[in-house]
Amino acid sequence: MDFSTLCIHGNIEKYDNTGAVSVPIFQSATFAHPGVGESTGFDYTRQQNPTREHLENVIKKLEDGVEAIAFATGMAAISAVMELFSPGDHIIAS
């Protein structure tokens, strides 16, 4: 798939319950589950939601990667990156 096509159609999903032809923006803070001990994969929006999951899947395909992680804030991203390094390590960033 061409790069520009992949940007638009990289992770096409059907939203049968809504009839949406593009990814809806899920703003729910919490999600209902079918029953006790049965999860839909989404519990709380700040942890994960269908909109962010879609974005991560598109970025993963665009970068030909294995995984992608989108953060809610820049500080969340910085904190996660800092956890990967040890005292005395050097980070070069621009």
Task: Identify the meaning behind each predicted range.
Residues T30-S79, L84:
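Conserved N-terminal alpha-helix of the aminotransferase class I/II PLP-enzyme fold
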Residues V23, I78, I92:
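Short, electropositive, low-hydrophobicity segments enriched in small/polar residues
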Residues F85-S94:
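PLP-dependent aminotransferase-like
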Residues P24-I25, E67-I69, D89-H90:
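Structural motif
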Residues M1-F42:
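N-terminal glycine-rich, Lys/His-bearing helix-loop that initiates the first secondary-structure elements
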